[in-house]
Amino acid sequence: MTSLKTKVIHGGISTDRTTGAVSVPIYQTSTYKQNGLGQPKEYEYSRSGNPTRHALEELIADLEGGVQGFAFSSGLAGIHAVLSLFSAGDHIILADDVYGGTFRLVDKVLTKTGIIYDLVDLSNLEDLKAAFKAETKAVYFETPSNPLLKVLDIKEISSIAKAHNALTLVDNTFATPYLQQPIALGADIVLHSATKYLGGHSDVVAGLVTTNSNELAIEIGFLQNSIGAVLGPQDSWLVQRGIKTLAPRMEAHSANAQKIAEFLEASQAVSKVYYPGLVNHEGHEIAKKQMTAFGGMISFELTDENAVKNFVENLRYFTLAESLGGVESLIEVPAVMTHASIPKELREEIGIKDGLIRLSVGVEALEDLLTDLKEALEKE
């Protein structure tokens, strides 16, 4: 079996079929010449298909063990297309600490179409079992989750969902296929914000989806073409180029994050650290079972919640910005940034405190990052 280190470089369509170019070219075209009336070639119109996008779609399917991949103009565009599989009256079980943008899409947009949902703590499998209704069609979650780094048991949740004839939809953005393989653990559909680790350089907005079901692939393909939120050829090329270095990047992100999490845990200025690589993390054993490393995301709380503003503004290498997964380190406060769309009462109920801080640990020199954090904590 080919190693993922090799697959990220040689997987999917890694060379151009027409010219043999070792980097698939950017086919910057909207339409394609046909052989004659009623005689289209493989591609007709770039909303329906484009060679550069197709190469990326084949690659994500290969990396995740899917039968077909789909590239969208953003992660949320991909989520929207997948959730459009469901109809009025259908019920979706949604992880309670899901990304704010996903929550907003479901709560403010999809409910208008008649879809219903419940937020459930999926780390409690009994709560999950109790949440199923006759109308339940899917369970949707991230693992590790954003921003609380909750680790959910993909195999167990998938098994429970299958017993209720429901699909398992896993957002694998934080782990990437390099660290975690949801389809192999029972998931039906895997989603990514490729803006993050897959692109890896904070220079592209993209979404990727894959499935292990030929039937679902046909439906998702229809929705991708019908909704039309497809990824352009230039952005497709950028994501494919980013994926080529996914292996060394994820190893570096994970190694740096582990040391930084341990540093924060030992600091008197920090009251709590959320990182799956710490042995006292609630999901540590599950993470060890289903991940090959623990990733580059850390969340934590300061002992003095009033010191958050000064802390985040006194860092040199951790840039205050939304998003994550680039080679550079970023810092944000979810309650006022990425998760502001979730009502305050609900945020507090699920544990996203106003003072929670999230780090996207980059691949810079570890000693520089540690010094930066140490000095900022001391300036509080």
From Swiss-Prot:
One of its GO terms (molecular function) is cystathionine gamma-lyase activity. It comes from the Bacteria. Its main location: cytoplasm. Disulfide bonds: none annotated. Its EC number is 4.4.1.13. Keywords: Amino-acid biosynthesis, Cytoplasm, Lyase, Methionine biosynthesis, Pyridoxal phosphate. CDD domains: CGS_like (cd00614). It catalyses: L,L-cystathionine + H2O = L-homocysteine + pyruvate + NH4(+); an S-substituted L-cysteine + H2O = a thiol + pyruvate + NH4(+). PROSITE patterns: CYS_MET_METAB_PP (PS00868). Pfam families: Cys_Met_Meta_PP. SUPFAM superfamilies: PLP-dependent transferases. Its cofactor is pyridoxal 5'-phosphate. InterPro entries: Cys/Met-Metab_PyrdxlP-dep_enz, Cys_met_metab_PP, PyrdxlP-dep_Trfase, PyrdxlP-dep_Trfase_major, PyrdxlP-dep_Trfase_small. GO terms for cellular component: cytoplasm. Pathway: Amino-acid biosynthesis; L-methionine biosynthesis via de novo pathway; L-homocysteine from L-cystathionine: step 1/1. GO terms for biological process: cysteine biosynthetic process via cystathionine; methionine biosynthetic process; transsulfuration. The modification N6-(pyridoxal phosphate)lysine is found at residue 196. It is found in: Cytoplasm. Belongs to the trans-sulfuration enzymes family. The enzymatic degradation of amino acids in cheese is believed to generate aroma compounds and therefore to be essential for flavor development. Cystathionine beta-lyase (CBL) can convert cystathionine to homocysteine but is also able to catalyze an alpha, gamma elimination. With methionine as a substrate, it produces volatile sulfur compounds which are important for flavor formation in Gouda cheese. This is Cystathionine beta-lyase. It comes from Lactococcus lactis subsp. cremoris. The gene is metC.
